[in-house]
Regions:
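Active-site-proximal "nucleotidyltransferase
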Residues: 1-120
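Catalytic nucleotidyltransferase
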Residues: 2-11, 105-159
Length: 159
């Protein structure tokens, strides 16, 4: 990997990518190839108008908590497999979101461009969890327009 430093991330050692050129390449790959940006919203705020619709039609709901929203992007860069947590917000004064490389073991095929959308949470015992809310991309195939049952079924297969 390029310019960066090792940090403690979710209680483990991880690599914080600082190279803005590499960050731009990663974000451009997601945007140009798959139309995925960190500004994409995957949720609706529950209110009195849409609650009636939800009551009348079957739905699967997930609740947004106080965790931090991240994509988990599994990809190959320069022939090496990477698991990249991409923060879905950009801190003030920065041009790019934080991108953290972690070591996760998945089947090799999943590293052919897979993107999970989820939330990092710490429980009351100080354990970190990544709650997957959605599957946006699987092995280079867009899952944005598939129904949630298909997406979650694929997530269970992957895990």
């Amino acid at each position: 990997m390029s310019k960066g430093n090792y940090i403690s991330f979710c209680g483990k050692r991880a690599f914080n990518i600082l190279d803005e050129t590499l960050k731009q390449e990663i974000l451009t790959k997601l945007h140009k190839n798959y139309y995925i940006t960190i500004k994409d919203k995957n949720f609706y705020i529950l209110n009195s108008k849409n609650i009636k619709y939800i009551e009348k039609n079957p739905h699967i709901l997930s609740v947004k908590s106080i965790g931090s929203l991240y994509y988990l992007f599994l990809t190959i860069i320069d022939g090496r497999k990477y698991s990249l947590f991409i923060d879905k917000k950009i801190k003030e004064g920065h041009k790019f979101p934080r991108i953290i490389s972690v070591i996760y073991r998945f089947d090799d095929s999943v590293f052919n461009d897979t993107v999970f959308d989820g939330e990092l949470l710490r429980d009351e015992d100080d354990n970190w969890l990544y709650i997957i809310n959605n599957l946006l991309l699987y092995q280079g195939e867009l899952y944005k327009n598939k129904n949630i049952v298909q997406k979650l079924g694929k997530v269970y297969q992957i895990l």
